């Protein structure tokens, strides 16, 4: 059975890099963050309603890649269940909506309640912020505030999770160790 591992955290905390590294290491695929594609195509001036479009696009992308992994029968050398690494989920959309607009679409909250994942990796803010055309929060105080919001969400839900921190190699090894433990 496919195990879905979601990587979340504030912007510029290495989520996409970690997803890509883990997918390569475990010989599987990863689901990128749909928001990047949407914002690159439509511009960085987004509305509350755009966030619902992004949320739906994220889940459509996740479902497409889930089908691809399930149909490919990707398994690692120990013949353990397949893995799918997901960069961003509806918790990220909830935090984004509430942080920017002070409210969240009901549809996003409904998806949080009904979707199931096997593990969360929460990326800490201890990496240097890297500027790109889509990032909004270069200041560490805001990023740490967002990190605490994500951590509170994970503490108050049932899916197991682990905080990922340190240098890039330390983060990668910590994530690999957590996933190997999950797969035993």
Spans of features found by a protein language model:
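Pre-Walker A (Motif I) flank of P-loop NTPase domains
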Residues: 2-4
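Hydrophobic anchor at the beta1->P-loop junction of P-loop NTPases
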Residues: 7
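The conserved Walker
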Residues: 11
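Conserved lysine of the Walker
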Residues: 15
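Conserved substrate/cofactor phosphate-moiety recognition/catalytic segment
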Residues: 20, 24-59
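Conserved nucleotide-sensing/catalytic segment adjacent to the nucleotide-binding pocket
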Residues: 45-73, 79-101
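A glycine- and Lys/Arg-enriched "phosphate-lid" helix/loop adjacent to the NTP-binding pocket
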Residues: 100-168, 176
């Amino acid at each position: 059975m496919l195990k879905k591992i979601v990587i979340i955290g504030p912007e510029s905390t290495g989520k996409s890099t970690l997803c890509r590294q883990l997918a390569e290491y475990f010989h599987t695929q990863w689901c990128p963050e749909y928001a990047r594609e949407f914002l690159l195509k439509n511009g960085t001036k987004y509305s509350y309603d755009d966030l619902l479009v992004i949320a739906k696009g994220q889940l459509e992308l996740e479902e497409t890649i889930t089908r691809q992994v399930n149909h490919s029968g990707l398994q690692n050398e120990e013949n353990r269940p397949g893995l799918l690494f997901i960069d961003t989920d509806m918790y990220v959309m909830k935090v984004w909506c509430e942080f920017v607009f002070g409210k969240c679409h009901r549809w996003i909250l409904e998806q949080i309640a009904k979707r199931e994942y096997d593990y969360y990796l929460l990326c800490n803010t201890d990496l240097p912020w890297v500027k790109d055309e889509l990032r909004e929060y270069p200041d560490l105080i805001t990023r740490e505030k967002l990190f605490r919001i994500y951590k509170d969400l994970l503490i108050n839900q049932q899916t197991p999770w682990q905080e990922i921190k340190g240098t890039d190699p330390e983060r990668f090894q910590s994530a690999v160790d957590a996933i190997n433990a999950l797969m035993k």
